[in-house]
A protein has these predicted regions:
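Flexible, charged surface loops at secondary-structure boundaries
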Residues: 1, 23-27, 57-59, 77-81
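Active-site donor-nucleotide binding/catalytic segment of nucleotide-sugar enzymes
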Residues: 1-41
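Hydrophobic, Leu/Ile/Phe/Ala-enriched alpha-helical segments that form helix-helix packing faces
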Residues: 18-26, 123-126, 187-190
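Short, surface-exposed amphipathic charged segments that create phosphate/polyanion-binding patches used
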Residues: 22-27, 45-51, 149-159
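A donor-sugar binding/catalytic signature common to diverse glycosyltransferases
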Residues: 69-118
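Nucleotide-sugar donor-binding patch of glycosyltransferase catalytic domains
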Residues: 102-146
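C-terminal amphipathic helix plus adjacent low-complexity
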Residues: 128-191
Length: 191
């Protein structure tokens, strides 16, 4: 069976390196990429000038399907259906967290590498108690242009363990009292 992957990123991500790694990696990959600003990088990887919604592109171990830009509900369904999700921005990583599937987050690139500080703060909280370092290593590489085939193969080799850990981590966050409830408790206590 192939690894199901969603790809939603900023155009400055190392897309060519990721697609190369997927195409030359140790397992078949079926990648779903909603049409967005990175479409030119995908087209170039496959030696095309343009790509269109509905295109299915193949190279090596990689089969990539170009999807239309999705509504939020459709995007949530895509996240739930995939084994691994590449997401961008804060809203997408929140949605990926609730999908309870392993994900790699790309923060929006900022001057003076502030996005890397944001990434490190996120990784410190999200990956607390994760015995594996691969999600952190891959996330850093994705934000710093350092994706390699060996790093990709390490990530997919641990995907089953990462899936179990991610499900537990999502349950941990779901068990916490939400902000609205905390505010109600706070006001009821007369503070």
């Amino acid at each position: 069976p192939s690894l199901q992957v969603s790809l939603f990123c900023y155009p400055d991500a190392p897309i060519k390196d990721l697609l190369t790694s997927m195409s030359q990696g140790n397992c078949p990959v079926e990648c779903f990429a909603p049409m967005a600003s990175y479409q030119h990088e995908i087209a170039a990887f496959f030696g095309l000038n343009t790509i269109n919604i509905g295109d299915t592109l193949n190279q090596g171990q990689l089969k990539l399907t170009v999807l239309p830009f999705l509504t939020q509900a459709e995007y949530d369904q895509l996240l739930w259906c995939c084994d691994l999700n590449f997401v961008r921005g804060e809203d997408s990583w929140i949605r990926a967290l609730w999908a309870s599937k392993p994900f790699i987050w790309q923060p929006y690139r900022q001057a003076d590498d502030l996005h890397l500080e944001k990434l490190e703060a996120f990784l410190k909280i999200y990956l607390k108690d994760n015995p594996s370092q691969i999600l952190a290593e891959f996330s850093r590489a994705w934000s710093e242009d350092g994706i390699t085939i060996s790093l990709w193969n390490r990530l997919i080799a641990e995907i089953d363990e990462l899936s179990s850990w991610t499900a537990q981590r999502t349950q941990h966050f779901e068990s916490q009292t939400d902000l609205a409830s905390k505010l109600v408790i706070f006001t009821e206590n007369g503070v």
